[in-house]
Design a protein with these regions (language model features):
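Cytosolic-side membrane-insertion boundary helix
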Residues: 126-161, 174-180, 217-220
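C-terminal domain-closing interface element
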Residues: 8-25, 152-172
Length: 231
């Protein structure tokens, strides 16, 4: 209702928590985020994947960041997700918030703020205007980012590699190709099944409710998550 409070605002860093521990994930951006991510690259310890903003744009529910998006502001949204069982409960309080999570918030936000206030280019009100989204992910402490055109080239190279492998393996007819695809699909299903079974077993051992995308306080949850996303 009081939109004038946004006058002069050029970039928003929204910090929220949907849990009490774990890495601080940059999980949402404004649309056409190429220029927005130029500034995010200033962070010391990035943690983000381009699939998460795409997912949140499809969900009917909003976040604390939604009000800024509705007012056409650019920026990012950062949150922790582990310890979700504490969310909106009496345990959702500062005493239960992980010190490591707080540090990770700071490791991302402080360098961004310093870059924003010290780099003259960010005084330009149009600096964050862009017409495209980026593909991005973190690998270790490195923030990997490239354009959607580059992504299409990479997908084309993968397709060519598959065709080369088919030729190299002398798979020359449809029957053999289908057999090859079927065999590898079976391997994939077996791997997924084993990962799923192991996940349920560990949840049972730890006395926790099993969630396919969320295993709070489960031992080896990182290994399980890697198995799931690889498949």
């Amino acid at each position: 209702k009081e939109k004038e409070i946004f006058d002069g605002v050029n970039y928003v860093i929204n910090i929220e928590a949907r849990g009490t521990s774990g890495p601080a994930i940059m999980f949402e951006t404004s649309p056409n985020n190429k220029a927005v991510l130029d500034l995010y690259e200033a962070t010391d310890k990035p943690y983000s994947y381009s699939i998460t903003p795409e997912i949140y744009r499809l969900l009917p529910n909003g976040t604390d960041f939604t009000v800024f998006l509705e007012n056409n502001l650019t920026g990012i949204n950062i949150s922790v997700l582990d310890g979700f069982e504490n969310y909106h409960t009496p345990n959702d309080n500062p005493d239960n918030l992980s010190d490591k999570s707080m540090q990770h918030y700071g490791d991302q936000v402080l360098p961004i703020v310093r870059e924003f206030v010290s780099n003259e280019k960010y005084s330009n009100p149009d600096v964050f205007e862009s017409k495209e989204d980026s593909i991005f992910f973190t690998l270790g402490n490195q923030f990997i980012r490239y354009s959607k055109n580059t992504n299409m080239v990479l997908l084309a190279l993968i397709a060519l590699s598959i065709l080369f492998a088919i030729k190299k393996l002398n798979i020359t007819n449809i029957k053999k190709i289908l057999k090859y695809i079927g065999r590898n699909s079976l391997y994939t299903l077996v791997t997924v099944g084993l990962g799923y079974g192991l996940s349920r077993l560990l949840a049972l051992i730890n006395g926790r409710k099993f969630e396919i995308t969320y295993l709070p306080l489960i031992k080896f949850e990182d290994v399980i998550f890697i198995i799931v996303i690889q498949e």
